[in-house]
Amino acid sequence: NSTTVDFTDIKSDVFDVHFFTFNNIDVTADSDRLKLRYFESGVVESGSVYEFATEQCDTGGFSVSQSTSSDNVPTIKNSGNQSNEHANGYTYIYNAGDSTKFTFNTYHSTTLTATPTYNSWFGSGLLPQASFVDGFRLFSSGNISGSISLYGIRSF
């Protein structure tokens, strides 16, 4: 259990695409989310420079959220912290190792919220500055538990 999980050896010089899977993720703070930041040349970018657009689907309907000045990009939305209120999902990250391009991500997750309501969440995020991304930080305001896996995909 930790509030932060860092991936600093992502071999961004080898892989064009990175793929996270999240299985049975729990957060200790009710209605918290799992968020993502990038390391640029070894330093975490924590400024309000990220952009994202998200569609949320739940039993009450649909909603949209977006930002052009966030300090993170989302991965998993507002899960509950009770038994069986786990979150599952995935995130693709593109162009991390290419200092001439912006770094993009897409994500999709499902969870039971604190009410508990079933929730599906999908969208995309952007670091709109050309930089060498060489690591990823996943974080939450409370402890994170569950299984997080990172895979590299190489183009030929």
Where are these regions (language model features)?
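Surface-exposed molecular-recognition determinants
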Residues: N1-F156
